[in-house]
């Protein structure tokens, strides 16, 4: 298989327009066309706006372009829907990728005109987009997330991922010290250590002395 991983230990700097107490530990484990995304320790004191984790955001080329979530297909020009408990629900983006949420999280699905400003000139900009994002609320304390992305699955893979109880991986650890995922199809285990960590019953690693990224396949 084709495997890889990405890890970030987020701590925002003490600069203008930043929140210096914003911390999070995030990982993404890639196994073939599956990506397991994990976040823990999402904490900050920003009360003026909610903290969000984007699942996807895509430009809309026509107003009747479909947006799909939780067995709902909508071609409305404007969508603003809140799913209060998205545990197990599937969201599909405009390029055929599927996102399955694995926690009872609040997810917001939108479609329509978005406005922003140019990051250099501050000139007003706008565009039509479809998006889905996890809403952690204002000033979250130790918030988390877990979701699975399946990249452009074929017809058989779509049937499998929509089946009840679909779970192609085992989440072995998910806390502020480590994220560990075992992929059942490839037999590969991914390790993201954020600090010194001791593992009692792992087949390969006894102790990590600090920040470590590792992927180990079955012999």
Where are these regions (language model features)?
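Extended repeat-based interaction scaffolds and adjacent low-complexity, acidic/S/T/P-biased segments
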Residues: 1-219
